[in-house]
Amino acid sequence: MQEMKPAALSGSNGLNGASGSSVRVPCSRLSRAGRMALDLQSKCAAYVLALRPWSFSASLTPVALGSALAYKLEGSVDLLLLLVCAVAVLLVHGAGNLVNTYYDFSKGIDHKKSDDRTLVDQILKPQDVVMFGAVLYSAGCLCATLLYFLSSLKLEHLALIYFGGLSSSFLYTGGIGLKYVALGDVVILITFGPLAVMFAHAVQVGYLSVLPLVYAVPLALNTEAILHSNNTRDMDSDKQAGIVTLAILLGPTLSYVIYNLLLFVPYLLFCILATRYTISMALPLLTLPMAFPLERQFRCRCYAKIPQKTAKLNLLMGLFYVFGIILAPQGSLPLL
């Protein structure tokens, strides 16, 4: 036995040497590397989930709508501008979601049954969320700077729209916390409707116009339905946390009425556009069968999955709306 130990340690070609020195150590290293890879993978997944990617349709469809309107006016769209604009809006939206996560947790609003449990379940630390949000806001500002060099839009107009949206995304729960004083619905109606559509349109055409504000109305109403259903679902926990939302002020019955208006008024507007101007505006009506089950669930107060389902409806309606505008014959759309 005394003679076999040195042979094994010296890495001889014998069985003991191979198993002792060339198998055990690499296995240990591979195991450690595997654990690090799994930790990194779970960390990245946590960051992605913290962004609430299912809500991104609310920011992507307005960008597509604004670009489609620019296409009908100018006859072409700069795809690079479209891409950079979409990334800029997504970065601000994601950062706003992180701000919302941080302040909801710090104010004791999020709990074990909340839709977003990133901080409640200690998946991420509060400082991680803050740092990630700051990185996204900074990256968004870089995209806005790039848009200034790529687009012919005046700097003051670009800054006004972009930083208006950025400020709204932060002040929704950060700072004065508009969400907590029943003003969150106003922020969503303005930011994820007229402002985002105008931004996408302006960077393409190089000037500000009232036209995108009008065309944004159907999409803005449907997007607000996502937030309203979310606030109605969280009504009891929000009351306990001491915050005030529009859903709390209205109560379940009036909240149901408002949800129906937000859900079905856009379809009425599409009917008017389709009958008076061009039949391509009837395309969003294809999503109408998806709206009736949502109305029934809201009426029965089965709120659990309504925000996510409304977001899915919002995405499809927005896409059909964009296609309807693109397919409209030249000169058939109202130009005010």
Curated annotation (Swiss-Prot):
Enzyme class, UniProt record, top EC level: transferase
Residues spanning the membrane: 79-99, 129-149, 158-178, 180-200, 201-221, 254-274, 315-335
Record's bilayer topology term: Multi-pass membrane protein
Enzyme Commission code: 2.5.1.-, 2.5.1.39
Biased composition (Low complexity): 7-22
UniProt keyword annotation of Cytoplasm present: no
A GO cellular component annotation in the UniProt record: Golgi apparatus
Keyword terms of this UniProt record: Endoplasmic reticulum, Golgi apparatus, Membrane, Menaquinone biosynthesis, Mitochondrion, Prenyltransferase, Transferase, Transmembrane, Transmembrane helix, Ubiquinone biosynthesis
Keyword Manganese on entry: no
One MF annotation (Gene Ontology) recorded for this entry: antioxidant activity
Region Disordered, annotated ranges: 1-22
Record note on what altering residue 65 to Q does: In reh(S587); cranial vascular hemmorhages in multiple areas of the head, leading to death by 72 hpf
InterPro entries associated with the record: UbiA_prenyltransferase, UbiA_sf, UBIAD1
Reaction equation(s) it catalyzes: menadiol + (2E,6E,10E)-geranylgeranyl diphosphate = menaquinol-4 + diphosphate; all-trans-decaprenyl diphosphate + 4-hydroxybenzoate = 4-hydroxy-3-(all-trans-decaprenyl)benzoate + diphosphate
Pathway recorded for this protein: Quinol/quinone metabolism; menaquinone biosynthesis; Cofactor biosynthesis; ubiquinone biosynthesis
Function: Prenyltransferase that mediates the formation of menaquinone-4 (MK-4) and coenzyme Q10. MK-4 is a vitamin K2 isoform required for endothelial cell development. Mediates the conversion of phylloquinone (PK) into MK-4, probably by cleaving the side chain of phylloquinone (PK) to release 2-methyl-1,4-naphthoquinone (menadione; K3) and then prenylating it with geranylgeranyl pyrophosphate (GGPP) to form MK-4.
Stated family: Belongs to the UbiA prenyltransferase family.
Listed name of the protein: UbiA prenyltransferase domain-containing protein 1
Originating species: Danio rerio
